[in-house]
């Protein structure tokens, strides 16, 4: 997964997907390696860290959704992302918790990961954004295959 994401594969991850893409998950005194696509670690808690409706404003560039769009859904997570302040984010949280400090939606290359469980009917721009990102990636991959290997 990390190799494909590093090559530019578009990845949209919600909650558990965000956790999977992190470097590691910590539960009590144990740490477990994860995919390593995101330069963050996740710590699990015994109580919810975010619970309820979440609404975000897309206020920074990202691979999937136009700036100015509003996305709505819910969050329910017992985890907190460590070092989230050191990554680029695309969402200003208007309602809810997200990653904390009023932000959600980490962006690394073409990976966007957030705690937001999106309600697709309340976020109509997302489907076309996901399909558009996938089509761009396919065109780039096809062009790279036609060009052949780089000379050494």
Q: Which residues are covered by each model-predicted region?
A:
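Cysteine-nucleophile active-site neighborhood
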Residues: 1-63
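Amide-donor transfer/coupling interface in amidating biosynthetic enzymes
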Residues: 44-152
